[in-house]
């Protein structure tokens, strides 16, 4: 796709796309470890993880599209925001270097607790369903809890990544494309690691 951007839009657009892709990938790679800890904590079998991440990434792309659209509109109206986003990009770079590995575990635990305040959460899976019933009342299954945390953590990461990428490019198409391909690549990366863990248990 990067080659298509270079041919269709020129080297400037190619540079913006590639920069956006690398920023998004470096910031969002934490999602892979959050997903792994989350599925382990909630005992979600690998065969159901595909369903959770399909809807999780679909929702993430919708939310990113909204964030990018709003951010681009704000920059068009208030040009000084570009400077603010540039400063945010520097701060984000520092945060990548000083990243703490336990943050993902904390976010996953808090996310499940937050859903528990909204509605009852069952401890048992009900096939691939997101909802079940406990005592005649509707309740979330661990699958929905996992989906909720996937979306919640993506919103948290998007708050970092979207302003950082908008500091590099204010072209919504390029920003969204770089986000989309980086996020879709994470799903493939996760299942590559998950399948490896199934075969080589010492990786756990």
Predicted regions and their residues:
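Multi-pass alpha-helical transmembrane bundle typical of ion/small-solute transporters
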Residues: 1-204
């Amino acid at each position: 796709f990067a080659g298509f951007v270079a041919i269709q839009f020129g080297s400037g657009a190619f540079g913006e796309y590639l920069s956006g892709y690398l920023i998004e990938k470096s910031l969002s790679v934490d999602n892979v470890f959050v997903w792994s800890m989350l599925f382990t904590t909630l005992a979600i079998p690998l065969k159901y993880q595909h369903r959770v991440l399909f809807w999780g990434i679909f929702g993430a792309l919708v939310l990113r599209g909204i964030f990018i659209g709003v951010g681009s509109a704000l920059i068009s109206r208030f040009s000084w925001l570009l400077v603010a986003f540039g400063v945010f990009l520097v701060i984000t770079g520092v945060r990548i270097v000083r990243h703490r590995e336990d943050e993902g575990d904390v976010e996953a635990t808090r996310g499940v607790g937050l859903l528990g305040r909204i509605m009852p959460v069952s401890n048992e899976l009900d096939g691939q369903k997101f909802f079940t019933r406990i005592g005649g009342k509707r309740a979330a299954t661990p699958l929905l809890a996992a989906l909720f945390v996937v979306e919640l953590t993506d919103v948290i990461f998007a708050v970092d990544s979207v302003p950082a990428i908008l500091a590099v490019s204010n072209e919504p198409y390029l920003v969204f494309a770089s986000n989309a391909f980086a996020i879709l690549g994470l799903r493939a990366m996760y299942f590559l690691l998950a399948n490896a863990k199934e075969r080589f248990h010492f990786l756990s």
